Amino acid sequence: MQSYQQPLRVGVGGPVGSGKTALLECLCKAMRDHYQIAVVTNDIYTKEDQRILTEAGALEPERIVGVETGGCPHTAIREDASMNLAAVEALARKFGNLEVIFVESGGDNLSATFSPELADLTIYVIDVAEGEKIPRKGGPGITKSDFLVINKTDLAPYVGASLEVMERDTQRMRPERPWTFSNLKKGDGLQAVIDFIVERGMLGVRG
């Protein structure tokens, strides 16, 4: 039987449209020259996120696998993660030397969490367009994720959101846990996410 190493599994969750796929594209493009990476995407009835990442050239197509979860998306990352676990194992066996596998959840609500059997680290993405109230609403995605990304800061003036209020509420809701504001269109906040993954995942700094 071919041996393979166990990669770091990083779960990326958040509501529909928050920027999960955009974050993954940025992470893959920034890290692929230094680390062996693959991605598992989750969609309810399609493999749309897999297609988006493939067409964006985030990674080689064979390193991106789409899972059609059906039903409620959080079930596939928490209560019954078997499809995702199988996809992760298949990628790890196929490449043998993978160091990081990102698992993107289907769009879900603030209560979504990853099973510890599926993700070693969790990143949760919300966006400013949902309003400044989102951080203080709490929920496991806000309070328990290992890293929180508040995306689309450029939209704050258009939706009447105060970044100062969001910062205050975020620090109150997760006082000991890291987070960052981001505007992925400009790359703002991306390095903070990469540094977190490298440090907490004990990957070693390269490049």
From Swiss-Prot:
One GO MF term on file is:
nickel cation binding
Q: Where in the cell is it found?
A: Cytoplasm
Which UniProt keywords are given for this protein, alphabetically ordered?
Answer: Chaperone, Cytoplasm, GTP-binding, Nickel insertion, Nucleotide-binding
Q: Name one GO cellular component term.
A: cytoplasm
Gene Ontology annotations of biological process type: urea catabolic process
Transmembrane residue ranges? none
What SUPFAM superfamilies does its record include? P-loop containing nucleoside triphosphate hydrolases
Can the keyword Nucleotide-binding be found in this entry's annotation?
yes
Q: Where does GTP bind?
A: 14-21
Q: What family is this protein classified in?
A: Belongs to the SIMIBI class G3E GTPase family. UreG subfamily.
Q: Tell me, what does this protein do in biology? A: Facilitates the functional incorporation of the urease nickel metallocenter. This process requires GTP hydrolysis, probably effectuated by UreG.
Assembly description = Homodimer. UreD, UreF and UreG form a complex that acts as a GTP-hydrolysis-dependent molecular chaperone, activating the urease apoprotein by helping to assemble the nickel containing metallocenter of UreC. The UreE protein probably delivers the nickel.
Name of the molecule in the record: Urease accessory protein UreG
This protein's species is Pseudomonas putida (strain W619)
